[in-house]
Amino acid sequence: MSGFSTARQNMVDCQVRPSDVTDLRIVDAMLAVPREVFVPERQRALAYLDLDVEVSEGGSARRFLIKPAVIAKMLQAAEIKDTDSVLVAGCATGYAAVLAARLAGRVTATEVDPSLAAKAREVFVQLGLERVTVRAADPAEGDPANAPYDVIVLDGATEITPDRLYGQLKEGGRLVGVFAMTQPPRAMIVTHSHGDFGSRALFDASAPVLPGLERRPVFVF
């Protein structure tokens, strides 16, 4: 077993499974998808650690792969079916989008940094994926042209209510992400039911805030 293969197994055994991830589809996906290919060469030694790993290289916004256990638990909570259409908002280099593609019927990913969106496309081709596409777009804007979606995954945190994304959920659709407007920050699931949006806390979590979903500064005079 290669060094990265061993690290991948250890990530699943020591981070993912102990975090109550019992969906074997997600476990199998995390064992199969090489997380290191989504990380710059200089950062690859960090790829499988319990860290938010920075993948941006000089762009206007710092971008990260969020902690493995956090994305695994959010995907499990979303209960993605093989017929579902999924939007991954703020995909960085595409790791969460690839995991989702192993669960869903169709995946669209958005990324604000064009160079990272291009990197994600390269990795998708490298891995032979045909059911996932990426667009260079603000995570907060979503993908209204192809909405509605069964599932929306925030590949990071939000400090504001992502109303535009709520509006892109199908009836019965689910949005999962880290909501940093609560203290402590928590992963949440929001469900669209009969025109209403109900939320439920999943677990305490932290993640870097996605571009466009930052809290607006308040000026006091």
Give each language-model segment a name.
Residues 79-198:
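Conserved nucleotide-cofactor-binding alpha/beta core module
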Residues 1-87, 95-99, 103, 116-126, ...:
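Class I SAM-dependent transferase core
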